[in-house]
Amino acid sequence: MTNAPPDYLVIGHLTQDLLPDGSVAPGGTVFYGALTATRLGYSAGMLTAAAGWAAVPPAIQVVGVPSASTSSFAHSYVEGQRQQLVHAVAAPISAEQLPQLWRRAPIVHLGPVLDECAETLIDAFPGALLGVTPQGWLRRVAGPLPAPMRPVPWRPAPELLRRIDLLVLSVEDVQGDEDVVADYARHCGCVALTRGADGVTLYVSGVPRHIPASPAQALDTNGAGDIFAAAMLLQLFETGDPDQAAHFAATTAALSVEGRGAEALPTRGGVLRRMRGEDGRR
């Protein structure tokens, strides 16, 4: 660990995707978020709980909570809809496990996937730009493992929502209930509702506007939502402009789905070239 906090700190479970061929791929908001930050030129750190974190690139600082297992998911598609089956759940994560130095990180991203982070973490970083992807607070494991997940309502107090600088959710996260997203936006100053290839509804001070998706030839959409959220949070830190940040993030996510795996993540230069209408892959 260095003598300075990471520029970007992401908190949540590092996960394993159990693939049909028997192989395992790393995933989770912490994985894709931290990779995005490093590709865009930031130092990154993650606070996670897992049985191990050898899959995390060495450029990313890791504070790991020991766990008997790593949160693991098997994915399948039924009538075009992704289905997830949970095979293992790692230990919970709390503010007490956070190094004191890391509490001064300027950009913090809370990314629960299985309710592993307490909402009280929202108040642990009063000086940071705080982003939240609340996917893991909107679902629970439905029974003994292996088991599917069931949606649950997330009703944070208005004062917690006011502390969040950027809230990013997908239409799937809220089961298509856009009224609840509008309710969040009454208290949270910047809310992004992602719609995949249909773009983003961006609420700023409660007022919605449409941000189009950046055109892409999609090969692998795994992690695209997490990549969007991290890129938008980082660009919001740089510019303070939600619209500009959302367009930048949409382009970053579009480039990421045009390849497979973490290697497809673009650099800052690649994103800017694509935004100018050039080939961001060069």
Predicted features by range, described:
Residues 2-4, 153, 180-282:
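Conserved phosphate-binding/catalytic region of the ribokinase-like
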Residues 20-24, 143-145, 181, 260-262:
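Short, solvent-exposed loop/turn segments at secondary-structure boundaries
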Residues 4-10, 15-24, 38-131, 274-282:
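Conserved N-terminal subdomain of the carbohydrate kinase-like
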Residues 15-18, 137-138, 216-217:
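A short, flexible beta-alpha/helix-coil linker loop
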Residues 35, 73-76, 199-203:
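Short beta-strand scaffold segments in enzyme catalytic cores
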